[in-house]
Amino acid sequence: MKTLFFFLTIAVLVSSCTSNIMTKSILEGKTQFSIPSLSSTIDPAYEHIGHFPDDMKIIFCQQCAFHCIEKKKNIPHCENSICRCTLENIL
């Protein structure tokens, strides 16, 4: 009986530690991203942004599409910095 209790206690501890380690590694994987280096061809007026306005629209639309896909919705259009997802689900 003591052996069974000891084994179950060890199993719970190992499971808990494994869960914590996996959660930390998943969070670290999500926060790691590459930051594009600033090019010397960027207009100094846009240097604080790091992208041209057209690039910002593309990035916004990519983030909008990702957001809609996470919600399992379609993206009908992406204009004027407004992100709208459709009401119907992706098939």
UniProtKB/Swiss-Prot annotation:
<feature type="disulfide bond">
    <location>
        <begin position="64"/>
        <end position="83"/>
    </location>
</feature>
<protein>
    <recommendedName>
        <fullName>Putative defensin-like protein 221</fullName>
    </recommendedName>
</protein>
<dbReference type="GO" id="GO:0050832">
    <property type="term" value="P:defense response to fungus"/>
</dbReference>
<feature type="disulfide bond">
    <location>
        <begin position="61"/>
        <end position="78"/>
    </location>
</feature>
<keyword id="KW-0295">Fungicide</keyword>
<keyword id="KW-1015">Disulfide bond</keyword>
<feature type="disulfide bond">
    <location>
        <begin position="68"/>
        <end position="85"/>
    </location>
</feature>
<comment type="similarity">
    <text>Belongs to the DEFL family.</text>
</comment>
<keyword id="KW-0732">Signal</keyword>
<feature type="signal peptide">
    <location>
        <begin position="1"/>
        <end position="19"/>
    </location>
</feature>
<keyword id="KW-0611">Plant defense</keyword>
<keyword id="KW-0929">Antimicrobial</keyword>
<keyword id="KW-0964">Secreted</keyword>
<dbReference type="GO" id="GO:0005576">
    <property type="term" value="C:extracellular region"/>
</dbReference>
<dbReference type="GO" id="GO:0031640">
    <property type="term" value="P:killing of cells of another organism"/>
</dbReference>
